[in-house]
């Protein structure tokens, strides 16, 4: 009996592995595009797991701090896990979250999101790539990838991206190459997560906490 259960699980995993989840998710998104875009709906796509930190969540936290009436639809790395244990998560991703994304006025990314290349976005929807790594310390994306199929998907995804934020004018060319994008799409205004360093912090409290923990 245990062997049959194991074989059944492996069969499900094989079927999941053969699915093109990029195209499936995009297909669901395109179906839900029939509905009207909501100006107060924003989608955050955390394809790279940051544990709820970084530029994506700086935007969310700041909007909530200001009391702005936005509804946030969050798609995490875990939602996109293709495995038998996440069948419920995939179902929710392809239905509820795809619907909310399709009706969002703004979509923010922290990594490449290849389903974007297959999506038919509304003219009312703006897509902004925040990228998780500030600066340009290594080659990535179009500067590094050699798989032609992946490069094709990346190029298509970039065509559906309105803006790519960079931390400095000095890396505009690097970002344009990495995202296979025209330089005009790269906006060098800094990254939201840098705002943390411009806030007032209680340094004395941190020193006391550090001192207490050091002497325990």
Regions found by a protein language model. Name each.
Residues 2-99, 106, 115:
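N-terminal pre-catalytic "stem/leader" segment of glycosyltransferase-like enzymes
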Residues 76-81, 113, 133-134, 169-170:
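Short beta-alpha junction loops
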Residues 73, 108, 126-129, 163-165, ...:
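Hydrophobic/aromatic beta-strand patches that form the interior of the parallel beta-sheet core
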Residues 7-28, 138, 143, 153-216:
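A nucleotide-sugar donor-handling region in carbohydrate enzymes
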Residues 38-39, 69, 104, 124, ...:
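A general structural motif
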